[in-house]
């Protein structure tokens, strides 16, 4: 007698769990296809981890590993850039010489751009120190073409107070006064960026 696994699956799991398993199942298959089995396991571990620790991925066609924090939003950022490839439409643009990355995070988008635009230079702005440290580590092999400014983009130059609202390392609450980490700001107009002169 053959088991009807679909019926067992439908009867034993509530619909919300079936939905979640379907979503994660598709994501894991896509991660495995795009990144390889070991990287997909590491990425899934990063998504499910309850405590923060450092992990690395060795991506196909990238010479150095990509470092990220397991148990934070870093794994979602890695997935968006390297598996979902949200920036792929931009690679159709030709003759790119200069890129500004406002919110460099841990450097995934910058790494993607450096790979796809080999003649471009990039200036990234990232206010959070832990993110900036990982950014530098991830972009070490492109250090001659990448410039990092540890500041926040704002409408005027001032000091802001950043507070991390949760384990998401890509979102922060911002105020001009407060008791959290003090971050200096820059404006695009005051950065005086040109292709010949970088800050």
Where are these regions (language model features)?
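Phosphate/nucleotide-binding beta-alpha loop and adjacent structural elements of enzyme active sites
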Residues: 1-199
């Amino acid at each position: 007698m053959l088991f009807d696994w679909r019926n067992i699956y439908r009867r034993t799991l509530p619909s919300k769990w079936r939905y979640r398993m379907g979503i994660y199942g598709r994501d894991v298959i896509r991660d495995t296809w795009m990144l390889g089995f070991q990287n997909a396991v590491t990425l899934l571990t990063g998504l499910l981890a309850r405590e923060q620790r450092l992990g690395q991925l060795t991506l196909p066609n990238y010479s150095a590993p990509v470092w990220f924090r397991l148990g934070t939003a870093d794994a979602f950022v890695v997935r968006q850039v390297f598996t979902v490839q949200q920036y792929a439409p931009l690679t159709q643009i030709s003759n790119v010489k200069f890129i500004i990355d406002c919110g460099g995070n841990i450097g995934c988008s910058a790494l993607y751009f450096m790979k796809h635009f080999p003649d471009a230079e990039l200036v990234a702005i990232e206010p959070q120190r832990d993110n900036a440290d990982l950014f530098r580590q991830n972009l070490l092999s492109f250090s001659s073409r990448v410039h990092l400014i540890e500041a926040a983009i704002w409408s005027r130059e001032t000091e802001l107070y950043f507070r991390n609202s949760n384990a998401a390392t890509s979102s922060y609450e911002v105020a001009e006064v407060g008791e959290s980490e003090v971050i200096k700001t820059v404006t695009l107009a005051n950065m005086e960026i040109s292709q010949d002169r970088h800050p």
